[in-house]
Amino acid sequence: MAKASVELTRELQDSIRRCLSQGAVLQQHRVKLETKPKKFEDRVLALTSWRLHLFPLKVPAKVESSFNVLEIRAFNTLSQNQILVETERGTVSMRLPSAESVDQVTRHVSSALSKVCPGPGCLIRRGNADTPEGPRDTSPNSETSTSTTHSVCGGFSETYAALCDYNGLHCREEVQWDVDTIYHAEDNREFNLLDFSHLESRDLALMVAALAYNQWFTKLYCKDLRLGSEVLEQVLHTLSKSGSLEELVLDNAGLKTDFVQKLAGVFGENGSCVLHALILSHNPIEDKGFLSLSQQLLCFPTGLTKLCLAKTAISPRGLQALGQTFGANPAFASSLRYLDLSKNPGLLATDEANALYSFLAQPNALVHLDLSGTDCAVDMLLGALLHGCCSHLTYLNLARNSCSHRKGREAPPAFKQFFSSVYTLSHVNLSATRLPLEALRALLQGLSLNSHLSDLHLDLSSCELRSAGAQALQEQLGAVTCIGSLDLSDNGFDSDLLTLVPALGKNKSLKHLFLGKNFNVKAKTLEEILHKLVQLIQEEDCSLQSLSVADSRLKLRTSILINALGSNTCLAKVDLSGNGMEDIGAKMLSKALQINSSLRTILWDRNNTSALGFLDIARALESNHTLRFMSFPVSDISQAYRSAPERTEDVWQKIQWCLVRNNHSQTCPQEQAFRLQQGLVTSSAEQMLQRLCGRVQEEVRALRLCPLEPVQDELLYARDLIKDAKNSRALFPSLYELGHVLANDGPVRQRLESVASEVSKAVDKELQVILESMVSLTQELCPVAMRVAEGHNKMLSNVAERVTVPRNFIRGALLEQAGQDIQNKLDEVKLSVVTYLTNSIVDEILQELYHSHKSLARHLTQLRTLSDPPGGASQGQDPSSRGRGRNHDHEETDDELGTNIDTMAIKKQKRCRKIRPVSAFISGSPQDMESQLGSLGIPPGWFSGLGASQTTASGSWEGLSELPTHGYKLRHQTQGRPRPPRTTPPGPGRPSVPVPGPRQENGMATRLDEGLEDFFSRRVMDESSSYPRTLRTMRPGLSEPPLPPLQKKRRRGLFHFRRPRSFKGDRGPGSPTAGLLLPPPPPPPPTQESPPSPDPPSLGNNSSPCWSPEEESSLLPGFGGARGSSFCRKMGTERLEAGEGAPAPGTAQQPRVHGGVALPGLGRTKGWSFDGKREGTDPDQEDSTQAWQKRRSSDDAGPGAWKPPPPPQSSKPSFSAMRRAEATWHIAEESAANHSCQSPSPASQDGDEEKQGALFPERMVPTRNAKLQEPPIGPRPPKPVAVPRGRRAPQVPGGREETESSSAAPGANKPRLRLGSQQDQEEPEGQGPTDQGRRTAPLKPKRTRRAQSCDKLEPDRRQPPDPTGVCGTSEPGTD
């Protein structure tokens, strides 16, 4: 503060300071103010930063008048001590005590004006009134200026404070602090009104007004903030005054319709305007404004570099004026680089757009062009761009437009020519544009011919390409090498992705792929598509770096893709948003993150994830050190926070902490990567190696005594291969350990240590030079202070301590930070090298072992063929069966190994090993299918056996080189497939020869034909949901309990008159009647007619049966084991012709154990053993049953097959007889038991088979070549007599139990499902009187279909089962 005049008392000065407490008083002078002409009064002049105050000489002090420095229009010095100040409100004349006081006041006013207005300010004249001097320039750039160096950011804070004082408003110190601190620290020359949007409109207006006099800021930015009229007026004022504002952004600022007209006028007023970027998007602007603006743009000498008029409601008329301006002003052709006219519907739909097309067709400098949503014709626009925009255009957005040419016609040549000629294009957006198929083909063809582009982003989302577009992409995309990012979202591809995804994988330049909203398919097809996608990203040469399936609603099936991320090494970014995968998907993602080391970014939201799912992710990130970014799942986090706020907050903080940790350089756990890769490399091939080595060792032992020299050479080579195979197990860990040991003191670490030492020396030398230079400069500027400091020896010693950098810091920065990053990358490369070497060696060993195995197996087969004596075991076999016997060993080698051992199969197994298996929660998984089939009474092994039979075949071509040339009968591989029923039997010249189906690795026949016969006859309605099926539901009897009232009421439904059908075979362990089944009675001792057959000769070295003990223990009743009766039908003929017999009939068969529970009733069923072999039969019966077998060979096929003749009409009972159902069934069961011991005629045999087919539809008679044994002829039963309801029929001599026991003769050997006690089964047989001269058919109650459907289930539920067996049994074959 300047020294106050001596005439002023201390009390007055303090009173003035107290009065001006808001501002510091810089000067106080006692002056004489001219109140009237030539009349002066004493006053006190007080000067503050921006204002001059006049006080009377009174205490307490009060302000008499004041004015701001900005109100000064002229400041004149009339004499040595008199000044004249002209203000907006009048003139002030005053005399100061001395000339020194005049100079002080003059310098203060000049300095204040220079701070507010850096340019030439007001004029200050000095001299007498008669002889005035010339003007004195007090601007800061002039020599006479007394202003000091400007403050930060061009003095914005001072200008803002002066304007606040001028307008009488309070100065916001926060504005000054933000500008002086934040803007200055960032060197930011963009004044953003959003930073101060919390203030009032008048405060914003003052800030904008301050920019008019500021030369630091060059850009005024405001977006999505509605500006008031006061602010907009100051914007126009700033543009009219500023000479440094280059860019104006008023995006969605609420501009009035006349603002552009005023803006055009401002451009005309300010000749020094340097504005070159104008952004007025998202403001309603009328055509008047555009017309005025176009006229002013004609006068811009340098043109505009950026013009954005998106969504401004501009009409084609305004666009025409703008286009004419572009063409008339040549400066725009070289200056305009950014043009945005998007979101103006109909703008380019008329002929007024030709003016803009003409400008685009001329050579120009456009780099960014956005015409999305303007209804322009894409083909016409590309024709204009072809001539003028090929050299500089990098961004082209033509979304939400259309093409002018019609569908079916050829695309204009501009499509292909433009995309083949453009040089710098990097982004093309054609989303929501209906591209005809021809235009899409032309686009892809043009890109395929362009050799200048690379990493192009092509957006074809929402183009409704569908199947035709998918086909075009498959055909053309493989030849396009410039596309680095492809967006195909929401195109309705759906099932076409099955073929499109593999085609996308063939393009190795593709790095980023977007496939969201294309999965609107059924569950089965969706799983196939996801498996194709998994196969794509698991390829070793996959080029994808990011994959997006956002908003696809994959739900739980997202886990199919997630399971492949664990071992994936190519993807660095994945987007799983909008799929609703819930917590179980988050759990699968956590498992993938635990072992993944390539993902850097994960985007996921809208997946219905709760706090529990986020907890799984947090736990996974504890062991993941490579994931850097995870998008904030706003939707899921907010939903989880509502239910569990504390847990959600803790879990998300934990996730963020892990991500922050991963963004710093650190040591990656290489041991985890080693163990993971070791498991993927070794476990997939180790099992195959073990099995191959075991097989080759057996063959070597079998051929070790062979004297042939070639065989011995091969044996020696095989032994060497086995040694290599054993050593290969230690190859992967040995190579990894070797690389780890050599890397500890390798050249990289040594070089880093030497570099650290050299850097430390260089740092010390540089600091020494800097210190000396600073000290010398300080001596020049402040020599006295330096001499004093050196005398005290303080400064240099303190500086010397500060200018040293610790050596351990430099060493840690190089070795622990940069060196650690280098070491991590080096470890990854070493691991990939070890993996490649191990894979290559193991593949070679597998190939050589397999070839050696095939060669030794061929030698072994030839030796066995030569050693078989003529007329031996193979005597009596047909040529086809002998050929199969000779080729048996060679055929089973691959299948027993599980797959063909070739490169394709090995790679497939490794890829499958890298993918996590499907979880049980996904519907359609094998586990769920097993449980569903088990609930329906189908054995659990059925589905797994079917799946195994379908997947064991490999895509191998090895077998093509080993086709037999002689001695074997060639058969087509599809000959064994099930076929639909034939309406006519085959002719005599074309006998039906059974063909054995393909085998699985355990020797069993495949189950591909399971369910085929039931498929052609099954009804649409499912009857399993209304009532449970038991064995009693097949035929009602007298012993059933009465139905409860609720069940009786349910039976009155609409569909309960229909007759239920049984499943194939008996129920599984979960059936209600599984515990009621009892084992059959022991068969009688063997007789001469059925001698026991010897064990079949093995075809290999101690070959085991067709199934293992575990599989044998899982056999189910009615299925002949887990393979079912189809296996028995396929294998029966081959076993019989090979001379294989069944186990001795005199041996009682023990109950099988399934799942730890003994299942009774698993004895030999209907003449079939568990080995799939028919009991011995008499050849005399073959001729009489040959025709019957031909008719019955396709009974399972369906409705078109042969049926037994219906009973005569006279045998059908009347309605009164229908009411005696229980007695009739009881007699029918006794008659059927007695009749089973009789000699069957063709008609009766057909009847038995028809009865058996209902309960056991798969248990059919073997193939035509099987021979039947004639059973012993016994007495026929008497004709049944109808018994009234409620009475018991008269007992036949011999009893029912004896009759049923006699049916277990070797000839019949029919399965039983008895409910009686064990004592009933041990009773001796009895004979009853029979009629020898009468042939009777199996007795059935002849009832109408409606009566059968109404009564068949009711007796079954009336009475509980009798454990004593008194109430009789139900024969399964009576249906």
Curated annotation (Swiss-Prot):
Residues 124-151, 864-901, 969-1375 are annotated as: Disordered. Residues 1007-1022, 1219-1229, 1348-1360 have a biased composition (Basic and acidic residues). Residues 138-151, 1098-1108 have a biased composition (Low complexity). Residues 1233-1244 have a biased composition (Polar residues). GO terms for biological process: regulation of postsynapse assembly. SUPFAM superfamilies: RNI-like. Its main location: cytoplasm. Residues 1047-1062 have a biased composition (Basic residues). Coiled coil: none annotated. It holds the Pfam family LRR_6. It comes from the Eukaryota. The keyword tRNA-binding does not apply. It is found in: Cytoplasm; Cell membrane. The keyword Ubl conjugation does not apply. Gene3D superfamilies: Pleckstrin-homology domain (PH domain)/Phosphotyrosine-binding domain (PTB), Ribonuclease Inhibitor. Belongs to the CARMIL family. This is Capping protein, Arp2/3 and myosin-I linker protein 3.
